Amino acid sequence: LTTNDIQAVVEPLFKREREKKEMAKLFQALRIEVNQEMIALKEMLNSASEVLKPGGRIAIITYHSLEDRIVKNVMKSGNIEGKVEKDFFGHITAPFKLINNKVIVPSNDEQERNPRSRSAKLRIAEKR
């Protein structure tokens, strides 16, 4: 089964004006599933706090909202679900401290030079 075969089957299902975007989403979803990208991302994030020394930094570039939500949750709360855990005194016990309070996105100039960068988001955190 080739990408052209898949495209031939699903193309009639999309409206003409949205066909390119919908096709891109379809192939992105297939790639994510086939490569098990979400599983790999979660495994890497779960082990990051174990392998980094205090003061060590992790920088992650995400390219779509599902990845970004997972990375943001882990960096803010220390877990994939985004549940903030507190100690007895009410202090947040997350293993990371955010380095950049706002996500870093490509400048307009970068996006003009490299259109594929338009969806990229960079998040940086430091091990406590």
Per-segment meaning from a language model:
Residues 1-128:
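S-adenosyl-L-methionine-dependent methyltransferase catalytic core, i.e., the SAM/SAH-binding region
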